[in-house]
Amino acid sequence: CGAHGTAISFLMNYDRLEFLDAVEELARRAGIEVPKETRQNNQDSDLRDQYAALEAAAKLFQRQLADSQRARDYLDGRGVDADNRARFSIGYAADGYSTLKDALGTDERRLKLLERTGMLSKNDRGHVYDKFRDRVMFPIHDRRGRVIAFGGRVLQKDDGPKYLNSPETALFHKGRELYGLWQVRQA
């Protein structure tokens, strides 16, 4: 192919990774752990927890889609078949104020984690509730395939904003992401 240089520079160019991301990806593939500062370890642990919480939310939404004939009919009507639903991990957030919260927010630490990922909101009285309700859910993946945010499309025309996206978080910066890029790169 005519490429030259190191494995790190190859990953930086081919996968458009930053230097540290390329080093971490190569280490992960080789089964080697990259040493980090203790302060960094605490931050990395929180980020890993956020990735895990978002992945758990995506799985919950996929199960809820399997249980919702109405949501599947909506997607069928839009030409989104079962193969594409699976390929893009499309799901459904049930119509309830605490479905996600009850399923994944099992203690105070997990509730705070779900708030940091933008999956829960808090009203003026301090009541915490699911941000996404009665919406087809589109997980947004980073370039490494990790779920970092969601876009939700309302099923009923008059039920709030047509599209609702995750807020910017430590993992998600809207201007830096392109929906579906990870899936296209897998093809």
What are the residue ranges of the model-derived segments?
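Short, acidic loop-beta-alpha module within alpha/beta folds
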Residues: I8-S9, L20, Q69, D73-D76, ...
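Long, structured ligand/cofactor-binding scaffold of large enzymes
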Residues: M119, L155
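Aromatic- and glycine-enriched glycan-recognition loops and surfaces
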Residues: D130
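Acidic, glycine-rich loop-and-beta core segments that form the ion-binding/anion-interacting portion
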Residues: G160
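Non-catalytic accessory segments of DNA primases and related replication-initiation nucleases
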Residues: C1-R116, H127, R135, F150, ...
